[in-house]
Structure formats: structure tokens, C-alpha cells
Amino acid sequence: MGIIEKMRLDGKKGFVTGGARGIGKCTATAFAEAGADVAIVDIDFEEAQKTAREIAEKTGRKVIAIKTDCTDKDQVDAMVKQVAAELGGLNFCHNNAGICINAPAEEMTYEQWNKVININLNGIFLTDIAAGKYMLENGGGSIINTASMSAHIVNVPQPQCAYNASKAAVIQLTKSLAVEWAKRGVRVNSISPGYIGTELTLNSPTLVPLIEKWNHMSPLGRMGKPEELEAICVYLAGDTSTFTTGSDFI
């Protein structure tokens, strides 16, 4: 079997949180193109349904939509059970839901801080644990968490201390779970994208003025494209990465 065949995800089942648009939509599409059945998990159910239909029509795979608030433990636990029941199992997941609030630290409210931490860190913890428990009891699997380059550096010129802190914590959570579960068949890795030109970013009145500055600081002189994250996620979800855990891909 050649490397391209080994990279395929035929027979695998997985879900993507924040999967209705942006990075999550691209990776969900890639998983399905590689042969997996996928659940689009998002708090925006209407958009998740639209994305699920598009991917199913494009790939011929079974793609479902599930409305979930990833900060609600009961909803997350129910989502994992629904994925396993409707798709026939759970082999991988991409925990991608997240937000960013730009505000100077001294002006950021405690409510704003908590909102970012709750979605970006607590939401990934809840999803990791729910998916991890299923995988530990059912032969293993692969968990992919979306962190950020902001876990490694301080972005400028925009102030975003809560986002930076939350994403740094995601990487350490990823490593901790990877060590705990390594000998039990569950791998946990993270990706740390740079500036990615998602539809929301490219159409944001507050972010568009910053794009030229970001591009100037990038060695490639441009933002990344969401689809440029597809290959690493397909690799991590599949069986060619079985010796890879606790790693962060920047």
C-alpha cells in the first residue's frame, strides 16, 4: 500500500467542533474527502446543517449536523454519544471551536476574560474528556485540538491577553492528556495556526485594517488559507501518525 492510500480515513468516524465555517469547515471537508464520516458540531445549527449538506453532496460520505454549546458539559456528553450512535463509532475528533476578544488588559472585563477562557479552554477540556472516555473504552482514537501561534508569541498590534493565555493552556492540556492516555491507545495533538484568512477575518471591520501589518511580519508575506491546514489534520486523524502524540504543529 502506497503512502497516499495509507493517508486515507476509510471507515473512520469523527466530529469537528466549530465545524460550520472557517478552519473547521475545511478540515471537516478534508476528513470526508479522505473517506471518513463526519459530524459538523456547532452552536449555529442552521449553518452546521448547510455545511453538512454541502460536504455530503461533494464527497458522498455520511455527514450530520449537531447543535452543541461546547461549554455545556451535558450537551458535549450528549453530542459524543450521538456521534457514536449515528455514525457507528468515534475514531477521531478536531476540537476547533473558539473565539477572540481584543481589548487592552486593563480595560478587559472579567466577563470578557471568562467568556474567552470558557469557550477556548474549558470547551476543549470538556470535549477532550467526553471523546477521550469513549475512545479509551472503544479501542483508542486520535484527538486534535486547535491552539494558536498566540500560544507561543504575543501578537501585535492587537491586545488579546485572554486569547493568548487560553491557547497556551490548550497546548499544555494537550500534552498532559497525551501522556496520561499514551499507553491506552488515545493520541492527543494540537495545531497552532498563524493568521488564517477565514471568511470572518477577511470581512471583519476591526481586523481588515490589521491584515497588511500581519502580512508584513510574515516571512511569506501573506495570511494562510484555511485549506492549508487540511493535510496536517488528516495526517493526525489517521493511522500514519500512530507514533505522534503530545505534539504541537505550528
Question: What residues fall within each predicted segment?
Answer:
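Residue(s) in the substrate-gating loop at a strand-loop-helix junction
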Residues: 148
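Substrate-binding pocket helix/loop in short-chain dehydrogenase/reductase
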Residues: 104-105, 109-117, 159, 214
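Active-site helix of classical SDR
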Residues: 128, 166, 174
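Canonical Rossmann dinucleotide-binding motif of NAD(H)/NADP(H)-dependent dehydrogenases/reductases
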Residues: 9-38
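Alpha-helical segment proximal to the catalytic Tyr-Lys
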Residues: 133, 179-183, 242
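C-terminal substrate-recognition "lid" of short-chain dehydrogenase/reductases
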Residues: 222-250
